Amino acid sequence: MEERNEQVVEETKEAQTEEATIEKNSEESVTEEATEETVVEEKSEAALLQEKVDELQAKLTETEGRMLRLQADFENYKRRVQLDKQAAEKYRAQSLVSDILPALDNFERAMQVEASDEQTKSLLQGMEMVYRQLLEALNKEGVEMIEAVGKQFDPHEHQAVMQVEDSEFESNAVVEEFQKGYKLKDRVIRPSMVKVNQ
């Protein structure tokens, strides 16, 4: 009977070992399947995450481009404002000078009158002094007369009102000036009205 008990114990052990092996194999199989599913899930998650990264990278690149364009636009705006401010400062006297030019023309015409008596001569001398002081004040602001007679005609500085043929002058030279022209710094306020040789 003891043999029989030993045999039963042995068979039970073998059965338990077989069950354990089957269970172990079953667990390994389940683990392998789970691992494969996990790998597939991780791959699809990785693909989704990569898509998201690519999408965010594209948005970042677009945003950086917009930011750089805005920054360049702002720098250009600042430069334009600075140039406008400098031009406004540089040419601030332009409207005043434009208003004074007709008075200068009248002074010049008045001083061309021939004085016959002492009273008229002294009046003309006083007008000439005022005229010179006015010119000096304008010169301090950067106003200067445009030279015309004997110079080559320049459409930016001269306005041709007549043409003549005169062998004493070169072709396209200014022969006579009817009204003086003026510049404020480098900007022509009023062109000279001139007669030009053909």
UniProtKB/Swiss-Prot annotation:
GO terms for cellular component: cytoplasm. It is found in: Cytoplasm. InterPro entries: GrpE, GrpE_coiled_coil, GrpE_head. PROSITE patterns: GRPE. Signal peptide: none annotated. Keywords: Chaperone, Cytoplasm, Stress response. GO terms for molecular function: adenyl-nucleotide exchange factor activity; protein homodimerization activity; protein-folding chaperone binding; unfolded protein binding. It comes from the Bacteria. SUPFAM superfamilies: Coiled-coil domain of nucleotide exchange factor GrpE (SSF58014), Head domain of nucleotide exchange factor GrpE (SSF51064). The keyword Cytoplasm applies. Pfam families: GrpE (PF01025). Its main location: cytoplasm. GO terms for biological process: protein folding. Residues 29-39 have a biased composition (Acidic residues). Residues 1-27 have a biased composition (Basic and acidic residues). Residues 1-39 are annotated as: Disordered. HAMAP family: GrpE (MF_01151). Participates actively in the response to hyperosmotic and heat shock by preventing the aggregation of stress-denatured proteins, in association with DnaK and GrpE. It is the nucleotide exchange factor for DnaK and may function as a thermosensor. Unfolded proteins bind initially to DnaJ; upon interaction with the DnaJ-bound protein, DnaK hydrolyzes its bound ATP, resulting in the formation of a stable complex. GrpE releases ADP from DnaK; ATP binding to DnaK triggers the release of the substrate protein, thus completing the reaction cycle. Homodimer. Belongs to the GrpE family. NCBIfam families: PRK14140.1. This is Protein GrpE. It comes from Bacillus cytotoxicus (strain DSM 22905 / CIP 110041 / 391-98 / NVH 391-98). The lineage of its organism: Bacteria, Bacillati, Bacillota, Bacilli, Bacillales.
